[in-house]
């Protein structure tokens, strides 16, 4: 999905006949891709679909298992702030509000941190780091220096992927996630 009309590369005439692609062009004010509305400001989870998922998990009582996943999905768009109203079709604003209200009523204070644009306090991150055994590169890069140093000091594995133990753990994670 490309939001907006991209400029045509000066190389296009030379390579277009080498490609066997057919581009699907759709002009819309609210492009939807894989359940997310896309905009120049960012993406927003389709609030109607999200609301339906929330109500289904309330009905089948699976909310505790799914709440963090669903909260993460909605927090992406929520963190756009007031811009969200400009980039959603008007009939979906009420569902976005309903999802936000649902999370405000049903999430713990620590879960609600996902809905905040403020940085997570360093004290909370440091407390969290003492409990985890593994951190993704993206998460690690967002941590304050003290937390990164602590994780490195408690790690018994070298920080390079050629280590057989690291490869073994990664393969176990892959099987676990499938």
UniProtKB/Swiss-Prot annotation:
First-level EC class: transferase
GO function terms (MF aspect): ATP binding; RNA-directed RNA polymerase activity
Family: Belongs to the tymovirus NS35 RNA replicase polyprotein family.
The protein's name in its UniProt record: RNA replicase polyprotein
Organism: Physalis mottle virus (PhMV)
Protein origin, superkingdom: Viruses
Keyword set, alphabetical order: ATP-binding, Nucleotide-binding, Nucleotidyltransferase, RNA-directed RNA polymerase, Transferase
Enzyme Commission number(s) from the entry: 2.7.7.48
Entry-linked InterPro entries: DNA/RNA_pol_sf
Catalytic activity annotation: RNA(n) + a ribonucleoside 5'-triphosphate = RNA(n+1) + diphosphate
